[in-house]
UniProtKB/Swiss-Prot annotation:
It comes from the Bacteria. Catalyzes the condensation of isopentenyl diphosphate (IPP) with allylic pyrophosphates generating different type of terpenoids. Substrate binds at residues 39-42, 55, 83-85, 87, 89, 212, 218-220. Belongs to the UPP synthase family. Binds 2 magnesium ions per subunit. Signal peptide: none annotated. Its EC number is 2.5.1.-. Transmembrane segments: none annotated. Its cofactor is Mg(2+). It comes from Thermus thermophilus (strain ATCC 27634 / DSM 579 / HB8). This is Isoprenyl transferase. GO terms for biological process: polyprenol biosynthetic process. Mg(2+) binds at residues 38, 231.
Length: 263
């Protein structure tokens, strides 16, 4: 009986998705979409599986959502996959994630979707905690795609919003010192634009829209500086369960909002 009901509901689901897709495609798209991928471990736990399996499901979902973004014409996407705080997780889980990052960085360098759609991949965050093998793999991927102009994909790995601002200020001060400026001269001339030029995302538009899955209603430090005027959407589903319908509903919500930018 349950299987029969599910079989009957699939055509209705498909029709609804198609209608929603047509509706959303007519509206404005965010230039820069931020994604906080939350809920992999909880998803695995609910199925009685290991956290590793949850992260594997999460990786596949990330590729799927990337394809949706390409379909919708979103030009810049930033996905947060690993925070600075995540290094505090159990060593065996961190090691598993490092192996996953290494595998996927190597795979993405040859992925037909990345190459055909001219996706430029950049990794933002602190790399000190990663193994030399992981760092070499992500640097190779960055070099492989540095000439691409179809989409900018930022992968936030070893990322923390506070750390990003600290790193930006450090770079700014070192640059000023190299130019022979005193601390007083730096302080007197400092502007928000000076900070922005030294962020990991320098040269890219600030995120218009940020989606977080898992039902958690917080940013947890994601793009702290850049999200001053972002719109937010908190989806009450775990990341591996995030469907195209959920994605389209989020975009529809964004399109219905009036952005005032503090005015």
């Amino acid at each position: 009986m349950v299987r029969r009901l599910l079989a009957l509901s699939r055509p209705l689901y498909w029709l609804y998705e198609k209608r929603l897709l047509r509706e959303v495609k007519r509206g404005p798209m965010p230039r820069h979409l931020g994604l906080i991928l939350d809920g992999n471990r909880r998803y695995a736990r609910a199925l009685g599986l290991s956290p590793t399996k949850g992260h594997e499901f999460g990786v596949q979902k990330a590729y799927e959502v990337l394809e949706w973004c390409l379909e919708m014409g979103i030009k810049t996407v930033t996905v947060w996959v690993f925070s600075t705080d995540n290094f505090k997780r159990p060593p065996e889980e961190v090691e598993t994630l490092m192996n996953l990052f290494l595998r996927e960085a190597e795979r993405m360098a040859e992925d037909h979707r990345i190459l055909e759609h001219q996706v430029r991949v950049r990794f933002i965050g602190r790399r000190e905690g990663f193994s030399p093998e992981v760092v070499r793999a992500i640097e190779r991927l960055e070099r492989r795609t540095e000439g691409h102009r179809g989409m900018f994909l930022n992968i936030a790995m070893g990322y923390g919003g506070r750390e990003e601002i600290v790193d930006a200020v450090k770079r700014l001060l070192l640059e000023a010192e190299a130019r022979g400026l005193s601390p007083k001269e730096v302080a007197e001339g400092l502007t928000p634009e000076d900070i922005a030029r030294h962020l990991y995302t320098a040269g890219l538009p600030d995120p218009d829209f940020i989606i977080r899955t898992s039902g958690e209603i917080r940013l947890s430090g994601f793009l702290l500086w850049q999200s001053a005027y972002s719109e937010f959407y908190f989806a009450d589903v775990l990341w591996p369960e995030f469907r195209k319908i959920d994605f389209l509903r989020a975009l529809r919500s964004y399109q219905a909002r009036e952005r005032r930018f503090g005015r």
